[in-house]
């Protein structure tokens, strides 16, 4: 591998702000902010809006979406006009 062209791989502290959970994960993400972790060391810090800790797919809190199609919706709205025009 060529020297100097690959990003630096290091531990980064991610914070899911929606559920206030922290994750220490290896990443190549570049950030200027740092934060002290439970082990007393300072790590690069990045906030997240959503992660596996808060996403409905992973938490099991999925909504059931109606599978009714666009044609059925059209027929429901305008089906009564079928023979009148």
UniProtKB/Swiss-Prot annotation:
Give the matching InterPro entries.
Ribosomal_bL28/bL31-like_sf, Ribosomal_bL31, Ribosomal_bL31_B, Ribosomal_bL31_sf
- Name of the protein in its database record: Large ribosomal subunit protein bL31B
| GO (cellular component) term, any one | ribonucleoprotein complex
Q: Which family does it belong to?
A: Belongs to the bacterial ribosomal protein bL31 family. Type B subfamily.
Q: Among its keywords, does the record have Ribonucleoprotein?
A: yes
**Native source species:** Aliivibrio salmonicida (strain LFI1238) (Vibrio salmonicida (strain LFI1238))
- Gene3D superfamilies the record matches: Ribosomal protein L31 (4.10.830.30)
The molecular function terms in GO held by this entry are:
structural constituent of ribosome
Quaternary structure and interacting proteins, as annotated: Part of the 50S ribosomal subunit.
């Amino acid at each position: 591998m060529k020297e100097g062209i690959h990003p630096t791989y290091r531990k980064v502290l991610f914070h899911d702000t929606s559920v206030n959970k922290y994750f220490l994960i290896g990443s190549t993400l570049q950030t200027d902010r740092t934060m002290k972790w439970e082990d007393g060391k300072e790590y690069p810090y990045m906030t997240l809006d959503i992660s596996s800790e808060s996403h409905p797919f992973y938490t099991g809190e999925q909504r059931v979406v109606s599978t009714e199609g666009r044609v059925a919706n059209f027929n429901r709205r305008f089906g009564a006009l079928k023979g009148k025009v």
